[in-house]
Amino acid sequence: MWNKVQETVNYLKERTNYSPVYGVILGSGLGSFTQDIAIDFTIPYSEIPNFPISTVQGHSGALVFGKINGISVVAMQGRFHYYEGYDMQTVTFPVRVMRYMGIQTLIVSNASGGVNPNYKVGDIVLIKDHINLFPDHPLRGKNEERFGPRFVNMSEPYSKELILKAKAIALQNQIEVKDGIYLGLQGPTFETLAEYKMVKILGADCVGMSTVPEVIVARHMDLACLGVSVITDMGDEENIEEVNHDEVLLAAQKAEPHVRQLIREFISAQS
C-alpha cells in the first residue's frame, strides 16, 4: 500500500506540481461544487495509477485541482463505496493519496437518510460523531507505521474546532445547519423500516453508505475532518417513505447551492 500511494502521489505531483491544503470528497449529487474552484487540472480517475473507477450514478470520477480564494484544494468528483465491490483499502486509497499530496484538512460530504424527527429533507447536517457498522475495517491487517499508529484514537473523529468554524460561517451566510451522529452501513440497499428503527435506537440521527471508512483512514494519518450530510430522505419508522437513487440525487442537488456556499466560504475564511 505504501509503495502504491507513493507511486500515485509522484504521478500527480509531476503532472500538477500541486500541494493542496484541503481535500474535499463530494458525495452523491454534490459534484458541481467544482464550479466554485478556479480549476488548474482535472484528471479522470482512469488516468491515475492505482486509482479505482467510480461506478455510481452521480459520481463523475475525476480529481480536480485548483484554488478557492487563493487556497489550494483537491476535490474528488465521486467517491468509492464498499458496496461497489472494492475492499476497504481501495475505498480509502484516495484519502491516503491526498494526505501525501499535502492536505491538512479533509472535508467529506454525503447524502444520507434522516431518522431524527427534527430533520427534514434538504437539511444540512454537520457530523459530530459516527457509528461504524460496516462489516470490514479499513485498518484491518498489518499496520503501516509510516501512515499512522496501530491503534487510532477516535474520540474526536470530526474536529470540534472545525464544526464551530463551520457553524459560524453558516450563521454569517444565513445557512441553516444542524448537527448530528452519522451511522454507516454497507448498502447498496436502502434501509428497511426495522433498520431505520435500529439506527434511531442506537443513537444516530442519519444513516448512509460512505464517509466512515474515509474518516477513519484520515484520522489514522492525523488529518482534521469536517463532515457534511445532506438529508435526502426521511426514515420515520411509523411512516417510511419509498425512496430510490434518482430521488436521492434530486434532493441532494436541491440542497447543493447551500452546501457549495458553506464549503466555499469555510475554505475561504481560512486564508
Where are these regions (language model features)?
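Short acidic/polar active-site loop segments enriched in Thr and Asp
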Residues: Q104-T105, D205, A224
